[in-house]
Amino acid sequence: IIGSTGSGKSTLISHFNGLNRPTSGRILLDGEDITALSITERARRGISYAFQQPVRFKGLRVGDLMNLAAGKDANIAEVCAYLSEVGLCARDYIDRELDASLSGGELKRIEIAMVLARGTALSVFDEPEAGIDLWSFQNLIRVFEKMYEQTRGSILIISHQERILNIADTIVLLKDGRLAECGPREEVLP
């Protein structure tokens, strides 16, 4: 999903995850109307969401958060694999608290690892490249490519980064809160 600042991108995806309710229309997930469902019910149905500004969970350790995301007691090897996939050394992070000692980029990568651990039907990312350094950005592209190849679900990304747009199969362009264009990348971004 692309569009200028204030075009409604974040508002649109806040309807998918249940943070906001639409004033008209319906939201369907695999043919099921989820418009009236709560955030929790939508998460149970398979929607995960990575915020533009990740949330800090004070008092919780990274390993605990990963277990919550996986929905089970993930073993150390699984947690390490998710953290490694987003470019974090698991040994350095698994026992760290999710507090002010973590940078925005570290939190962003932990949040992306959480989405990977959930393995949901719809993974929504709001500007996932925000606050991430160049090396991590290169790795982020690989993470999305791998998710796309290995998942049966859908990945929805709000971004302006050309390298992320280049891996998209469909681009949605919003303008003034309305759908301006939608189609294959080659047609929307000539």
Task: Describe the predicted segments one by one.
Residues E127-P128, W135:
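Walker B catalytic motif
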Residues F137-Q150:
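Helical segment within the ABC ATPase nucleotide-binding domain
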